[in-house]
A protein has these predicted regions:
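A conserved catalytic-core segment of Leloir-type glycosyltransferases
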Residues: 2-7, 11-12, 17-31, 66-131, ...
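Active-site proximal beta-strand in glycosyltransferases
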Residues: 33, 145-148, 160-179
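Short beta-strand/turn micro-motifs composed of small residues
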Residues: 37, 69-71, 170
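Short, solvent-exposed amphipathic helices
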Residues: 149-154
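A generic structural motif
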Residues: 61-65, 143
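Membrane-proximal helix-turn-helix segments that form the acceptor-binding/catalytic region
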Residues: 134-137, 174, 185-193
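Short amphipathic alpha-helix
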Residues: 47-58
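Short, charged, surface-exposed secondary-structure boundary motifs
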Residues: 92-96, 176-183
Length: 193
């Protein structure tokens, strides 16, 4: 049986006058932007370098930029504000397993981050997103837009559901990288790890 609606079942919409987006109030003013990045190393990888360059370019255009980041923190233009969301930063720790007993653990999210990391997972995007969503609960109206820098975290959906407009930048296709790794794996067993 077809799931398609017949014309009789389709809702009717009243025609609207076209709206010139340039005429909307507030559209032609500097934006208050929140730019998340779960880690923003200023010298290696691309996220910290991208964050420094894009926020400087946006500040040059007159926008008000806040960057919310986990460690390592980015180096930003002085016109941009850095909001630090501390994590366990287990990738910088030569003995991450010891973090459980070192007094670093503050809450259950830290326990989850520690467990997930030490069992071979990659918890940073998830745990950063949870911390950021909690931080954002009292700041829903502080920003015109949240421009995600590839955190791809669930916390962004929570922020969207709070009423914050969210958009994202993805720098490269992870799935393509995975397919290439699997195709060129010397051992079929390692292709599934």
């Amino acid at each position: 049986m077809s799931q398609a609606l017949s014309r009789a079942d389709m809702p009717e919409f009243e025609p609207r006058e076209p709206v010139d987006a340039r005429a909307r109030p507030g559209i032609d003013r500097p934006l208050r932007m929140l730019m998340p990045s779960y880690r923003s190393n200023p010298t290696t990888g691309g996220q910290g370098v991208y964050m420094r360059l894009i926020t400087k370019a946006l500040a040059d255009r007159g926008h008000e930029i806040d960057v919310v980041s986990g460690q390592p923190y980015p180096v930003l233009d002085p016109r941009c504000r850095l909001i630090k969301l501390p994590s366990l930063d287990l990738y910088a720790d030569p003995h991450p397993i010891k973090a459980l007993w070192s007094g670093k653990i503050r809450d259950w999210l830290d326990v989850k981050e520690w467990w997930w990391h030490n069992s071979g997972g990659f918890p940073e995007p998830y745990t950063f997103g949870e911390r950021m969503a909690k931080w954002a609960e009292t700041r829903v109206n502080d920003y015109d837009i949240v421009h995600d820098n590839q955190t791809l975290c669930w916390g962004l959906l929570k922020m969207r559901d709070m009423g914050m407009p969210v958009l994202g930048t993805i720098h490269h296709p992870f799935t393509r990288d995975c397919r290439i790794d699997i195709k060129h794996s010397p051992n079929p067993f390692f292709a599934f790890l």
